[in-house]
Amino acid sequence: MGKLNNYYLQSYGCNVYVETGTGHGGTLGKAYQHFKRCYSVDIDQELVINAMNAYPNAKVGLGYSNDVLEKWLSSGEFSQEDRILFFLDAHFPGADYRGAAYTVEGEYAVPLQKELELIKKYRPNGRDFIICDDARIYMLGPFECGNVPDLQVKGGLAFLKDLYPFQNISINFYEQGYIEIDNRMV
């Protein structure tokens, strides 16, 4: 689970923060200080309730990231003028906090591709910045926390080429690795 330790969230020129994977709320707490509106989703009811209590002005949803993200994106919750910083961290639901298996198999195990497809569908002209953690489950490389060759998503990051221009995508090898997609200058 990434924590965006090496990121200055306020430096991206965004006014809205959306994360998938609330966890203990550490990253939400960091964002809560800098954004007009914050959104977070998790499948763990206890973690959601704790985040709602800690950050009463944030909108915290309970459910699978794809479902809640689509609800927010399709509802008119965000205008095209909004600049959103997305932090996509909902893979391996239940594994970090409730002992579920770390696996890349199953519909909800690694929702990154679907999450990015939803963002592209509902915000085709959005001037957003997207950070996705755990790049090391999509590729091998000089990751600070090492590689996980036994836990690789089939096809890796090939799906990105159909969603975003190559020049907007970069890989950061800090910690478990981050995929960064910069659409602010689209």
Tell what function each PLM region has:
Residues M1-L73:
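SAM cofactor-binding core of SAM-dependent methyltransferases
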Residues Q10, S74-F78, P124:
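Residue-level signal for alpha-helix termini/capping positions
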Residues Y12-G13, H34, Q80-D82, G126:
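Residue-level preference for short coil/turn positions at secondary-structure junctions
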Residues V18-T20, V41, G63, F86-A90, ...:
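Active-site flanking residues adjacent to catalytic metal/cofactor-binding acidic residues
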Residues Y32-H34, N53-P56, S75-G76, G99-T103, ...:
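Short, glycine/charged-enriched secondary-structure capping and boundary segments
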Residues A58-K59, I84, D128:
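Short, conserved active-site loop motifs that form the nucleotide-linked donor/cofactor pocket
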Residues E77-L88:
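Short SAM/SAH-binding signature in class I
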Residues F92-V186:
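C-terminal substrate-binding/active-site "lid" region of AdoMet-derived donor-dependent transferases
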